[in-house]
Amino acid sequence: MKMAKKCSVFMLCAAVSLSLAACGPKESSSAKSSSKGSELVVWEDKEKSNGIKDAVAAFEKEHDVKVKVVEKPYAKQIEDLRMDGPAGTGPDVLTMPGDQIGTAVTEGLLKELHVKKDVQSLYTDASIQSQMVDQKLYGLPKAVETTVLFYNKDLITEKELPKTLEEWYDYSKKTADGSKFGFLALFDQIYYAESVMSGYGGYIFGKAKDGSYNPSDIGINNEGAVKGAALIQKFYKDGLFPAGIIGEQGINVLESLFTEGKAAAIISGPWNVEAFSNAGINYGITKLPKLENGKNMSSFIGVKSYNVSAFSKNEELAQELAVFLANEKNSKTRYEETKEVPAVKSLANDPAIMKSEAARAVTEQSRFSEPTPNIPEMNEIWTPADSALQTVATGKADPKQALDQAAETAKGQIKAKHSGK
């Protein structure tokens, strides 16, 4: 899901779970007294407010406050906050993609959260790291998503699934005939291609010892990245990927081929579970395959979070609400309503959640995933990298030439737009 990726996927993920006991910190009687009569506004994702209905009611009763929930597309909320926040019509708590955190913090749109270590320790390392900027916490993980492998059980059984990407290439050579295909992926986009490139040593940004990103160290054109791109190019060059899945509309073509039973397997995310189910496809879901070097294909973890607006006039109570919404009990309840995989570690073994094949696949793949870089400089990577990979896919440039140009363009844009930080 292109919007989710660059806000970015299903995010789907880090291993997660939760126990039934709520873990939000108790508020003192004086704090409760000061909150009496207050009103908080929460911006929740579209068609997801039912997942927090009970939590909101409980919070209202305990704190004697009114909480108004407004649904907005989570990937667009930061845009609305830029206008509505200063105008006094914005939220106290909002939800947003983890890879937007850095930009939001740089623009002064979010409040730093001050929560106890035991609250932070509830969540998977990757998900909580996505909420950190300069070692400061700006959100609590709500849900995770990452890319996984969907396969059509009527075309290929679980036992027949190739174990490596190279084996999928061989399988596709035998089955693709121009109208039907074996394995498909949107490898002309860095969000998906990074799964292959990083397996051979490529990376987006290098990291310092403290885990922070170094935007001056770009690895999308190193030797490993080029090797991964060369493997990707084979799928297009040999006619195993149709031209229709290249470019902005590629995702629609890829999904249609799968729902029409014309592709045995595709890389997608949990955001398509409902659509594929409604299409009547007899599908299975599993983690991504390995590479020939024995490494697992990685993926970006998309993390949705609860954050406190810098414009909130009741930031202490807003933080209480964010902690409450993201606690163990409420995370599990939200999963039961929305099927979004929570980021709480204990959920990794929760039977109620692990009975879902999609949740199991996201949890397993999350072991090999990394958060989408959340620094503002990431905005300068997407377009040059995607453009380069499209020239690789169409055969207009060799991988090294294309990726060298992408890295050079990204470095120039970072210098021009971010050097004054």
Curated annotation (Swiss-Prot):
Keyword line: Cell membrane, Lipoprotein, Membrane, Palmitate, Signal, Sugar transport, Transport
Keyword Cell membrane attributed: yes
Effect of inactivating the gene: Deletion mutant displays a 2-fold increase in the doubling time when galactan is the sole carbon and energy source.
Membrane topology field: Lipid-anchor
Residues anchoring lipid (S-diacylglycerol cysteine): C23
Cleavable signal peptide: 1-22
One of the record's GO molecular function terms: carbohydrate transmembrane transporter activity
Highest rank taxon of the organism: Bacteria
Induction (free text): Repressed by the transcriptional regulator GanR and induced by galactobiose. Also repressed by glucose.
GO (cellular component) term, any one: ATP-binding cassette (ABC) transporter complex, substrate-binding subunit-containing
Keyword Repeat annotated: no
Subunit field text: The complex is composed of two ATP-binding proteins (MsmX), two transmembrane proteins (GanP and GanQ) and a solute-binding protein (GanS).
Protein name (Swiss-Prot/TrEMBL): Galactooligosaccharide-binding protein
